[in-house]
Curated annotation (Swiss-Prot):
HAMAP family: TgtA_arch. GO terms for molecular function: pentosyltransferase activity; zinc ion binding. Exchanges the guanine residue with 7-cyano-7-deazaguanine (preQ0) at position 15 in the dihydrouridine loop (D-loop) of archaeal tRNAs. Zn(2+) binds at residues 276, 278, 281. Disulfide bonds: none annotated. One of its GO terms (cellular component) is cytoplasm. It catalyses: guanosine(15) in tRNA + 7-cyano-7-deazaguanine = 7-cyano-7-carbaguanosine(15) in tRNA + guanine. Belongs to the archaeosine tRNA-ribosyltransferase family. This is tRNA-guanine(15) transglycosylase.
Length: 490
């Protein structure tokens, strides 16, 4: 199937898109609630009321249980689950990762998924866990590659075929695998065997795995982060270009009495108040929810409401050009997520190619903001500013500046730029009057680079007394340095 994914809006690596399937169009990014055919806390037909457009279930479980298999073959997957929207099916790879083996071949499970009418079919890949020896990861990747090549020949027609990207925690293997799969033209690309990283809060490594995989894929391909179900990390993953998530967390957490929010998880037993306004939390107090006979179901519903509320906020943030602001807010919910944010910005040079040239006002959220793609883009374009004669650089207008040939504004984290561009993106940024050390470092470094690129100009640099930084001394070697309080009023 060609042209199955259409990108509508972009911000950083994130995008809003339309994924076309045999049972309808899905708007991404979105979450696929996991449906266990044996145990359904919330029925599939109810899922649309929470915002679900697509579900995911395990074809291996259906295949292994005779009663389920018979109904699925007679009525189809959608008849079995009672859901008329798109359904993706996993192949049994999860069971393979847990138990070490499955009683089905790749060809058998592919054929079964095809017969029962799955919208997105997944081959039986090898989910290589993190931290294994490189040779094992390489060997298992070779087996996965053979199975995926066979699957691509086997599955033709309207049903979508997923090509899982494996490679353990080796970025070079992830990128190599993704590049190979790109040539096979799968319709969806899941990133597999990442659940252990998320369970261990190894978000920095997760970022590297996603980035490496994305670098090997076409930028127009839809990407599914397998097993990602907690909303606190959705924004981070979306900013890297993930489009689909799947969540069993809504049910698993409810069974354990855990209450999901976009900033983390609470234990219901310890809550005095419900910090949410979903239909469940608007109707019940924390104490009433604890005592409810259907507590698990109600908690599962809240978890779904919270999950899809975050997806909607992410989409609006993409529309507004504010995705990275949301990412920076969410990543302050946990120190390990903050590690993920810092690792994200080590990939800013790659992200910059996808980030729109103009968008909403840049808002400073913390020291990490100085490493965003738009700041890097400004640094790369410093050589476009050609300055001659006298040039004054100031943080705000000063008397006598009209006597200079060029007037520049200094604003962290960017640096110095022509004053007439102050209201132009990204220089209309909302930033603190007194920047932190890292942000000031970036701005002063860029200003020094601008001075070095324009040796024929004679610079005067006026700044605040509070700008205490070693690079101020370097600025003083290339310009007349004056603190604002000492600037001679004219």
């Amino acid at each position: 199937m060609s042209a199955i994914f259409e990108i509508l809006d972009k911000d950083a690596g994130g995008r809003i898109g339309k994924l076309r399937t045999p049972h309808g169009i899905v708007e991404t990014p979105t979450v696929m609630p996991v449906i266990n055919p044996n145990i359904q806390l919330i029925s599939p037909k109810e899922m649309k009321s929470f915002g679900a457009e697509i579900l995911i279930t395990n074809s291996y479980i259906i295949y292994r249980k005779e009663e389920l298999r018979t109904v699925a073959l007679e009525k189809g997957l959608h008849g079995l689950l009672g859901f008329d929207g798109p359904i993706m099916t996993d192949s049994g790879s999860f069971q393979l990762s847990v138990y070490g083996s499955v009683e089905v071949t790749n060809e058998e499970i592919l054929g079964f998924q095809q017969k029962i009418g799955s919208d997105i079919i997944v081959p039986l890949d090898i989910p290589t866990p993190p931290d294994v020896h490189f040779r094992r990861a390489e060997e298992e990747l070779a087996v996965t590659a053979e199975r995926l090549e066979a699957a691509r020949k086997f599955i033709q027609g309207e049903q979508l075929l997923a090509g899982p990207v494996q490679g353990s925690t080796y970025p070079e293997l992830r990128e190599k695998a993704a590049s190979r799969l790109r040539d096979l033209n799968f319709e969806v690309y899941p990133l597999g065997a990442v659940v252990p990283l998320m369970e261990a809060y190894r978000y920095a490594e997760l970022v590297d795995v996603i980035a490496a995989s994305k670098k090997g894929l076409s930028p127009t391909s839809p990407v599914h982060l397998f097993g990602a179900g907690h909303p606190m990390m959705f924004a981070l993953a979306v900013s890297l270009g993930c489009d689909l998530f799947d969540s069993a967390a809504y049910a698993l957490y409810a069974k354990d009495g855990r209450y999901i929010t976009a900033n983390g998880t609470y234990h219901l037993e310890k809550l005095n108040y419900l910090p949410c306004s979903c239909p469940v939390c608007s109707k019940y107090t924390a104490d009433e929810l604890r005592k409810a006979k259907n507590k698990e179901e109600l908690l599962g519903k809240h978890n779904l409401y919270a999950t899809f509320a975050e997806i909607r906020l992410i989409k609006q943030s993409i529309k507004d050009g504010k995705l990275l602001e949301l990412v920076e807010q969410r990543c302050r919910a946990h120190p390990k997520l903050l590690d993920g944010l810092k690792r994200l910005y080590t990939h800013s040079a790659w992200l910059e190619q996808f980030d729109p040239a103009t968008k909403g006002t840049y808002f400073y959220c913390g020291p990490e903001s100085s490493f965003r793609p738009e700041v890097l883009r400004f640094e790369k374009r410093l050589d476009r500013f050609s300055l001659e004669g006298s040039a004054i650089i100031r943080t705000a207008p000063v008397k006598g500046e009209k006597d200079y040939d060029r007037v520049l504004t200094f604003k962290a984290p960017f640096g110095s730029f022509p004053a007439e561009m102050e209201e132009v993106y990204p220089f209309n940024a909302e930033v603190p009057k007194f920047p932190d050390y890292e942000t000031l470092s970036t701005a002063l470094s860029n200003t020094l680079k601008l001075m070095e690129l324009n040796p024929g100009a004679e610079f005067t640099f006026i700044c605040e007394k509070e700008f205490e930084h070693p690079l101020i001394e370097e600025i003083g070697k290339k310009a007349k340095l004056v603190y604002r309080a000492a600037w001679k009023k004219e």
